[in-house]
């Protein structure tokens, strides 16, 4: 159960980081109102808090390394759904390798 909560927090952090960053992108690059930037900044603050919800035995380095791999996969998916850029075989292979790597980093049994 703890691993499921942990994965949920990684996914939630990804949604908040990508969502907050996208709102700021819309404000600065596409001329949306300042409210987009403000909401984006608040969402990014929440993104910074979410990783602290990982299990007590987690350490900063492993949590952020793992999140980096999750972010890679979520970014590929976001590019596909938001920007209509279909992932090619190299995107998929790279995302898969990153995902396997972070699962080992975060969840491999340690003595």
From Swiss-Prot:
- Record carries keyword Transmembrane helix: yes
Q: Which residues cross the membrane?
A: 7-27, 33-53, 60-80, 85-105
Topological type in the membrane: Multi-pass membrane protein
Its keywords, alphabetically, are: Cell membrane, Membrane, Transmembrane, Transmembrane helix
**What organism is this sequence from?**
Clostridium perfringens (strain SM101 / Type A)
**InterPro entries named in the record:** UPF0060
PANTHER family in the record, alphabetically?
UPF0060 MEMBRANE PROTEIN YNFA
Q: Which family does it belong to?
A: Belongs to the UPF0060 family.
Chief place where the protein resides: membrane
Q: List where in the cell it is found.
A: Cell membrane
Output the Gene Ontology cellular-component terms: plasma membrane
Which Pfam families did the record assign? UPF0060
What HAMAP family does the database record attribute to this sequence?
A: UPF0060
So which domain of life are we looking at?
A: Bacteria
Protein name (database record): UPF0060 membrane protein CPR_1507
